[in-house]
Design a protein with these regions (language model features):
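Solvent-exposed alpha-helical segments within well-ordered globular domains of core cellular machineries
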Residues: 10, 25-28, 32, 63, ...
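Ser/Thr-glycine-rich phosphate-binding loops at phosphate-binding pockets of nucleotides
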Residues: 109-115, 136-140
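Charged catalytic cores and adjacent phosphate/nucleic-acid-binding surfaces used
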Residues: 1, 39, 52, 74-105, ...
Length: 346
């Protein structure tokens, strides 16, 4: 059996499940790091290079991984919270034979700045996105309901909008062909309602609506999704299942109904690129392939470095057979804004 980074991530995840205290946390961090290695550990070892060149790998862990590369043992099905994830290395390899997915992408529609829990300024995020050749990005800092992420209230959202307008003027004067869209990641309750005054959303270009509470529910949550899709303030449903690598498997729902409802409502379902989310998964994307629903790609980047997560969503969509025409990030800016304007956010 060939040992991949995904396999190593699972083996480390199992060690975390079995350990306690700081060892549990250390193995958990290592498992997450393995997902994001840009090259297969087996390829590094085959060149007789040190496995310590891989992020998060020290001498002890390098010896353990080397042992697994020699004898991984029997393959075991991952638990639900680690099932259906893919490694960054596999995404890069796949896109290497489908370069048009990178070349035709026009923008990234979910990211965060220092206006909420991001680590970089609006300008830093914009300049980094321009360097990637994007036509546009949407800044989607958290709304006020998510206190842990320093979510914005209506006054802060207005101030951010003024800063975005000034930034766009500055970028244009510097010859950068990038448009920063005014957006927000709005907290949705169990009924699908948002936490912001609708009037404060009217100047925005895009609203991503996301669930951030009651995420460990074991009940069927179809009703919650249908409420969100019926919310006229929402353009994009963010990280739809709310799954997190090694933490929770995601919400349960009738996904056939949800894809159909999204198609009728004209709401895009996000393919969240964060390696710990990868949400929607390839399996769900395949389920929604023929539904007529639209999709949106967002890295959920909280730093300029995390903009590279986009590869995971691109490869997932390509692997699932999603037509690029149904992914709004491949649209020209005028078409994107026309679509967004067709949905009332008031």
């Amino acid at each position: 059996m060939s040992v991949t980074n995904l396999h190593i991530a699972e083996l480390l995840g199992r060690r975390a499940d079995e350990a306690e205290g700081h060892r549990r946390r250390a193995y958990g961090r290592a498992s997450s790091a393995a997902l994001m290695w840009s090259e297969e550990a087996a390829a590094v070892a085959a060149r007789s290079e040190s496995l310590e060149t891989l992020a998060g790998v020290g001498p002890s862990l390098a010896r353990r991984i080397a042992g697994w590369l020699e004898d991984p043992g029997d393959e075991v099905e991952p638990p639900p919270a680690r099932r259906g994830f893919r490694s960054y290395a596999s995404a890069l390899e796949q896109l290497g034979t489908h370069e048009q997915w990178r070349h035709e992408l026009r923008g990234d529609l979910q990211m965060h700045s220092t206006h909420s829990d991001g680590k970089a300024s609006l300008r830093d995020m914009a300049v980094a996105a321009a360097a990637r050749g994007y036509d546009y990005i949407s800044i989607t800092d958290h709304s006020q309901g998510l206190k842990v992420a320093r979510g914005m209230d209506e006054a802060e959202l207005l101030r951010q909008g003024q800063e975005v307008d000034a930034l766009n003027e500055n970028l244009a004067s510097e010859g950068m062909e990038l448009r920063v869209l005014r957006g927000i990641e709005m907290n949705l309750d169990k009924e699908g309602a948002g936490d912001m005054d609708p009037q404060s959303l009217e100047p925005l270009d895009l609203v991503v609506g996301s669930f951030h509470s009651n995420l460990r529910s074991t009940e069927d949550e179809t009703r919650r999704y249908l409420g969100a899709l019926a919310n006229p303030q929402v353009h994009i449903l963010g990280h739809p299942t709310a799954r997190r690598f090694s933490r929770r498997a995601g919400l349960k729902a009738d996904w056939d109904r949800i894809f159909e409802a999204a198609a009728r409502a004209g709401v895009a379902l996000e393919i969240n690129s964060h390696p710990h989310r990868q949400d929607l998964s390839v399996d769900l994307l395949r389920k929604g392939k023929d539904s007529g629903a639209l999709f949106s790609i967002g890295t959920d980047a909280h730093s300029t470095e995390e903009l590279s997560y986009i590869e995971l969503s691109l490869s997932a969509a390509q692997l699932a057979g999603i037509d690029r025409e149904r992914i709004i990030n491949f649209w020209e800016l005028d078409r994107l804004l026309e679509w967004a304007g067709s949905r009332s956010v008031g």
